[in-house]
């Protein structure tokens, strides 16, 4: 990626972690359709590989604003996709895709982090990977830890996530009939791919 700073990428990962970790509340629903968010999307579109994914997400958000009971409908989508059995869902856990659920724990230890007691999900949840990537990008921007060490850990995290993210995104696209989480996951996929290539 060329136009986004490490801090901006960190913010995108943190934002995505929040949206994949729990159902949207009324405040978040208002925020994603705000002028401030439109500016943020505009900034993301300064990165050419992200343009199509951001446009798709913006279209879903525009449709969402006229959807009756939008919050309840999105909550049902979230529940159906991420909290049910894996038959017609996109479970947000590395272990659901036959990946080593201990890998993220090792990466967190290496980063000097641990999961919060407030987050009642297994450590191999997608949001934990995204929080770790956010933390690493913020650390890159601060310059307090050697960049080579942070970058090595960032690459390991991206590689571990890439082992199962494409299948997760494919399942989101297959089973999310409204398309908000499908669009969100597509944006994440493109972001991770760009981040991974930016060695």
Curated annotation (Swiss-Prot):
Which UniProt keywords are present, listed alphabetically? Chaperone, Cytoplasm
**Cited HAMAP family:** TorD
Descriptive protein name = Chaperone protein TorD
Q: Name one GO cellular component term.
A: cytoplasm
Gene3D superfamilies per the record?
Answer: 1.20.120.1820, HscB, C-terminal domain
- Location of the protein in the cell: Cytoplasm
InterPro entries on file: Chaperone_TorD, DMSO/NO3_reduct_chaperone, HscB_C_sf, TorD-like_sf, TorD/DmsD_chaperones
């Amino acid at each position: 990626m060329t136009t986004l700073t490490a801090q901006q990428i960190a913010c995108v990962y943190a934002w995505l972690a929040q949206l994949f970790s729990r159902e949207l509340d009324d405040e978040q629903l208002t925020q994603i359709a705000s002028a401030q968010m439109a500016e943020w999307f505009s900034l993301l579109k300064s990165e050419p590989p992200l343009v199509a994914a951001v446009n798709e997400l913006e279209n879903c958000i525009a449709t969402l604003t006229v959807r009756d009971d939008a919050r309840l409908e999105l909550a049902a989508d979230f529940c159906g996709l991420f909290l049910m059995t894996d038959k017609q869902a996109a479970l947000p856990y590395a272990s659901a895709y036959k990946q080593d659920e201990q890998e993220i724990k090792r990466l967190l230890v290496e980063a000097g982090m641990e999961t919060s007691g407030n987050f009642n999900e297994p450590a191999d949840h997608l949001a934990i990977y995204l929080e770790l990537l956010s933390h690493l990008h913020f650390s890159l921007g601060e310059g307090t830890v050697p960049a080579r060490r942070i970058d090595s850990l960032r690459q390991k995290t991206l590689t571990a996530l890439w082992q199962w993210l494409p299948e997760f995104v494919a399942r989101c696209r297959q089973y999310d009939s409204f398309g908000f989480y499908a669009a969100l996951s597509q944006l994440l996929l493109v972001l991770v791919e760009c981040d991974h290539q930016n060695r």
